[in-house]
Amino acid sequence: MAQAHKESVLAAACVRTPVNPYTKAPLALYERELGERQQQRTASVSPQRLPRTSMGTPAAPAAALDWEEARCCKSRRCQDWVFDISKVHHPDKDYYVQVEKLKKAHLQNMEQLEKMYDKKLHLSGVHNPENEQGVVREVYRSAWEPKSVLPAEYDDKYLKHSLSGSVSPSLSESSHESTNGDSSDSEHSVSARNKILDMWNEFTVEDYIRNSEYFSKEIAKNKTSKKSKEWSHKITIPEPFQMTIRESKKKEMNIKSKSEIELENNLLKKKLEEEAECQKKFRANPVPSSVYLPLYQEIVERNEERRSFVKEKSKDILLATQKPFQFIEREERKKTLRLDFMNLSTSVPSANHFKAKPVPKSIYGTSTAERLKEEELYRGIRIHMRAQELLQNSSYPTITLAPGAHSGTKKGKCYKPKEKQKHKPKISATIPHSQTMHENQQKRLPESTSTKHVTVCEPFQLRTSNIPSHKEKIIMDIQADEENLKETRWPYKSPRAQARIHSSAGTLNPQGEALCNIPRSTELSKRREHAIRKREKQRTKDYMKELEAMEQRVLNKPLLIERVAQRNALMSAEKQYLNVLRDLGLSEEFVSKNGQSASVDEHVSVREENNPRAESTEGTLVLEDLLDDAEKYQTDPESEEAQEEDAYSTDEDHSMEEI
């Protein structure tokens, strides 16, 4: 198969189709035949072709000969600079020529189809109204046909040029006239200018004035010359198509087509085959023994063995190719050196000498309380200095300098209950003198501008006294709440209090609503607030006293260095005393019997049992001694919490005391 395909491809590659010499495109068979016919026609055309006049009629022979001689002379003069335009490739021209040919062929086909349709209608006996207008259609036929932009003769020339590949008609005419001369010289003797002149010589105006007034008049004359038939009233009766009639007849006669018959035969064959298959008897083969073999388990075990073998093999390969990192070796060397150093340090006993830390600088400085007092004093001095500077640089407010500002303070914008004025304004009967008032104002003006008044703060006028209140009822409610409900006393809302219904709720403004929501200050609430403030002040005083006492205890307490030195001195004295007793040969029992320094002996014996290396310390302080000392001076945290609870109390305790 592959060899046959290769041979066919090779044969197809060897075959070369003919190519158009102008477009270099492959030519089809019908195009080649048309080209050959066109060449034969051009060869058979006589060389004595006469030119046409401007009106389309053939010219006289003498005039034609003179015209041909003049054109030959012109062509001989221009032989040196002539450029053969026939040899230039014009693909657009060939394309448009082919399009015109196709249009003409299409029109011819449509005419043939129309004639065939008319014949069929005539045979079937159907009246064709178009036959009556056949004459008119023939008149307008020339107008319907599409014309090219160029004249008819010019199109024919270029059509011959495109099909046969020969020279233009003008060039062929000159070549036929000079038959005795050389063919090669005649082909190159025509120039572009001569070709353009040939076009204008063969130009006719009739090709471009088909739609003119003259042409329309001729068509009108032809119409009037023919007799017009009278109009006859007829009704169009629709008739069915022949194919519908034929199909209906077939259905009535129950005639089946060949394809339907074949389809029925195939269906019958299939049914018979299926019935034959269903009637056959069969017996199933026994189940093969290979089905019962545990093949899956064997495959799984084999895979597991292979996986474990590959794992071990890869591990061995990795261990064989593994190389330790440099930092691992370095760390191992460090570990060995560290262990050696530890062994040396344990073998050689070293004397641990106590080295005290330097005394902090805060001990020699002033105490924190004194520093705080100094900072407070400096802060007060700075505040006082700043207040004096602001007082000197301050100016009197510009609002107070306005007319009427010195008469009184500005009235606050607050809600006032509408009350009727009991007094009437006094109207002065005297008219003030404007000139004197102006002079007095001019005198007071420099004084007010030179002096800088200090802003005076006045107390707020909240107008709470103007609000009506039921003091007795409020006091009774508060007392009842304190006796029965501790959690619902003032300032919390009492459940027994009746909701006040405002009759003028819709007419109140936002300021009045805000004032109604403000809790009212009573004498009892003022007394309670005063007592709370007093207790807070007492608590702060007690707290400050306790802080001072704590600071005093810390200052009076000896320093850790002093305590360590005292303890070391005591221990060295006790040790020296024991050494003296040992040198004298006295035992501890003798000392205990006599009751001398019994407590000291017990302390020393316990310390020797716990620390056998105490002899090498030479009377220095050990970490255990510091811990014991810290335990002595350490206070119990629970006792401190109890003391703090006794010293400070919460608001709940005060509330319980009030109850």
Swiss-Prot record:
Biased composition (Basic residues): 408-426
Entry GO CC: centriole; cilium; cytoplasm
Coiled-coil regions listed in the entry: 96-120, 531-557
Compartments it resides in: Cytoplasm, Cytoskeleton, Cilium basal body; Cell projection, Cilium; Cytoplasm, Cytoskeleton, Microtubule organizing center, Centrosome, Centriole
Lineage top rank: taxon: Eukaryota
Stretches with biased composition (Basic and acidic residues): 600-616
Region annotation Disordered: where it falls in the sequence: 34-59, 165-190, 401-428, 594-659
UniProt KW keywords: Cell projection, Cilium, Cilium biogenesis/degradation, Coiled coil, Cytoplasm, Cytoskeleton
GO biological process assignments: cell projection organization
Database matches in InterPro entries: FAM161, FAM161A/B
Bias-annotated ranges (Acidic residues): 637-650
Sequence similarity: Belongs to the FAM161 family.
Function comment: Involved in ciliogenesis.
Protein name stated in the entry: Protein FAM161A
Organism of derivation: Xenopus tropicalis (Western clawed frog)
